[in-house]
């Protein structure tokens, strides 16, 4: 098992985007909303809630360092907060496919001035930094923004899977993060630092976010290099432990909870934002108008044609079918015998493994004729795998599964494709944090 509590430094790249046009520039490239006004160009691009936040344009000056909007498309009250806390988001390509996931931070978190220009830090995996910088410069054109790598800043992640920490985060957000206007956001961000609710004195905090991709999943924070200095205050440490863990431990925890990041998959994998559960992880706005890749995304949401989603999976030897069938959540075990079989498969080759039903039957899809007059030939069935493996570590992983399949069964088998065509089992799990 991975540690239930941990603090890690993550291999992330940080790109700073600042200048008079920074809010408009970033808004046009990501799936979350930064502009208070909605520019309506096509009827299907704006949801019916389009007029419910008209006051935002009165309290937000997009040419100043105002912060970020926090919203949840599944919140029935449709509340939007204005905060200095960071948010989860995505960059898409022009075809609506995922370019990269990211976190966006208001910069700096505290000690900001209302007279400063908009200033953001975008956090992505280090392996995707060069590609993202090229994308940003491609779209810059005449925009009055500066794009630069943020040097000598570290990305940290802390998680704690106890009810006490969950309650702590609820109170923390209510007291410091869920603010309604830029002035209050600046005041509460500074108070969080001054109160030492989390961070010790003189810790150079650059950015902060509660990771709500899954409710209260952890906290993310950016600091100038700490040189092994403990970031937490005495008050925080009196309540919670903070043992050091690896970035790999953080990734395995994501896997077992069904949370994909683009760096987890090989570069030739093409995936849609809804397939990564972006709508479930507070990374999508339906009320922001146009952005790169937006049209397909909103049409998919409104059309309700989401057939596949990423879910956590556990691999097992087929002799353990009965014990696996009784499990309700994946259990990470690097010493599981099935790991020896999986070690023969490279990350790039994972997606080519065929997931099939345990009973040996094939998933099928109707093959519809394109003729308006139908066809005299019998309707054919097109064979389709039950899903695609995207990432793995040890005996757990992430797979893109057909929702129609996993609604009826969770046990599948996979042929490794070695000399003996070894077959292993795969169990899919529907995360408990998915909206009902």
From Swiss-Prot:
| Paired cysteines (S-S) | none
Pfam families recorded:
Beta-barrel_CAF17_C
Q: List, alphabetically, the GO terms of the cellular component aspect.
A: mitochondrial matrix
Q: Which GO terms describe its biological process?
A: iron-sulfur cluster assembly
Query: One MF term in GO for this entry?
Result: transferase activity
Keywords associated with the record:
Mitochondrion, Transit peptide
Compartments, as annotated in UniProt: Mitochondrion matrix
Identify the stretch(es) annotated as Disordered.
Answer: 359-387
| Top-rank lineage group of the source organism | Eukaryota
**Main location as per UniProt:** mitochondrion
Once renumbered to this chain, the transit peptide range reads 1-42
The UniProt entry, under NCBIfam families, shows: ygfZ_signature (TIGR03317)
What is the official name of this protein in its record? Iron-sulfur cluster assembly factor IBA57 homolog, mitochondrial
Question: What organism is the protein native to?
Answer: Meyerozyma guilliermondii (strain ATCC 6260 / CBS 566 / DSM 6381 / JCM 1539 / NBRC 10279 / NRRL Y-324) (Yeast)
